[in-house]
Curated annotation (Swiss-Prot):
Annotated function: Catalyzes the initial step of the lipid cycle reactions in the biosynthesis of the cell wall peptidoglycan: transfers peptidoglycan precursor phospho-MurNAc-pentapeptide from UDP-MurNAc-pentapeptide onto the lipid carrier undecaprenyl phosphate, yielding undecaprenyl-pyrophosphoryl-MurNAc-pentapeptide, known as lipid I.
PROSITE patterns linked: MRAY_1, MRAY_2
Name assigned to this protein: Phospho-N-acetylmuramoyl-pentapeptide-transferase
Annotated organism of origin: Borreliella afzelii (strain PKo) (Borrelia afzelii)
A molecular function (GO) term: metal ion binding
Membrane-related topology note: Multi-pass membrane protein
UniProt keywords, alphabetically: Cell cycle, Cell division, Cell inner membrane, Cell membrane, Cell shape, Cell wall biogenesis/degradation, Magnesium, Membrane, Metal-binding, Peptidoglycan synthesis, Transferase, Transmembrane, Transmembrane helix
EC number: 2.7.8.13
């Protein structure tokens, strides 16, 4: 809205990003208590898995879920004020945000209604993810410009691969994998949102660099015209995420639920696709990938041997069972996530 006024100051990306971040954060602090109270009145409580850590049944019962509503409401309102709402990348990201959030909302709603941890049937959830990812990646493929189907590899500036139309299924895989990985990691107070903040911060740096032709040429990375609006979007997401963490930090007053986790993963995955940072994103999301692999390994080994590799999966529950406190697990995973982010950002220069 402000951007369309044409004021000179609003042409500066860093200015709009800063105020999009602050706006979303402050709005979260203002509306957060009201949303939490409303969800409590609606009895939208987190439904816990009976096979999860036993202490969660006593400590986390009665905490409202669907906290993704808080995140994305504040992000969207901030974007309306500070972003160029006509930018094609902005429109794609917003579609992904609302599409996957809607899917997660249905899942959360069914869990609350049925009073069980089994919400939307797995196949219907996957169908929804396929539909939303196919639409968004296809739009990106046809409107995304000259670099859209090319995969760039860290460390090797001259090595790249053009997937052509096969970029669409590749991009769909990134979105669905990221969405589900973030969903699996959302099990402890502040864990998933804290890791998301780290990734968002790193992607802001990447988005700013790719939006600048001079920086992109110096670092031998593609210059993505129009990607400056991703800096604004990610700034708003960063502010909204910090605002949510204010209430989600231990002991949490609200959980993001599938409404938040499914959409957050998809949003950051789509951002990586637009910025041509698909391989780099696999480093950024290292903790999420490890968490997902722990579940896959646990299931495969147990089916074949009836033995468990981990005391409990995903991996964060394994460390809880080893005696780590919840905050120890969360902060140590944040540290590991930050290390992955530093490694990922360092690859931009090492080419």
């Amino acid at each position: 809205m402000f951007y369309l006024l044409g004021l000179r100051l609003l042409k500066y990306i860093t200015f709009r990003m800063a105020y999009a971040t602050i706006f979303a954060f402050l709005l979260s602090l203002i509306v957060g208590p009201h949303i939490i109270l409303r969800l409590k009145k609606l009895r939208a409580d987190q439904i816990l898995r009976e096979d999860g850590p036993k202490r969660h049944l006593s400590e986390k019962t009665g905490i409202p879920t669907m906290g993704g509503i808080l995140i994305f409401f504040c992000v969207f309102i901030s974007l309306v004020f500070w972003s160029n709402i006509l930018n094609v990348y902005f429109l794609i990201i917003v579609f992904v945000m609302f599409g996957f959030a809607f899917l997660g909302f249905i899942d959360d709603f069914l869990k609350i209604k049925k009073k069980t941890s089994d919400g939307l049937k797995a196949r219907f959830k996957v169908y929804g993810q396929i539909i939303f990812s196919f639409i968004s990646v296809s739009i990106l493929y046809y409107l995304g410009g000259e670099h859209v189907s090319i995969i760039y590899f860290p460390f090797i500036k001259s090595f790249k691969m053009d997937l052509g139309v096969f970029y669409i299924p590749f991009g769909m895989f990134i979105l669905i994998a990221a969405s589900n990985s973030f969903n699996l990691t959302d099990g402890l107070d502040g864990l998933a949102i804290g890791l998301s903040i780290v990734i968002t911060g790193a992607l802001i740096i990447i988005a700013y660099i790719t939006s600048r032709a001079d920086f992109a040429a110096y670092l031998h990375i593609p210059n993505i015209k129009g990607s400056e609006e991703l800096v604004i979007f990610l700034g708003a997401l960063l502010g909204g995420s910090f605002g949510f963490l204010w209430f989600n930090a231990y002991p949490a007053k609200i959980m993001m639920g599938d409404t938040g986790s499914l959409a957050l993963g998809a949003i950051l995955g789509m951002t990586a696709l637009i910025l041509k940072s698909e391989i780099l994103f696999s480093i950024l999301a290292g903790v999420f990938i490890i968490e997902t692999m722990s579940v896959i390994i646990q299931v495969i080994v147990y089916k074949k041997t009836k033995k468990r590799v981990f005391k409990m999966a995903p991996l964060h529950h394994h460390f809880e069972e080893l005696g780590w406190s919840e905050m120890q697990v969360v902060i140590r995973f944040w540290i590991i996530g930050l290390i992955f982010a530093i490694i990922a950002l360092s690859t931009i220069k090492i080419r």
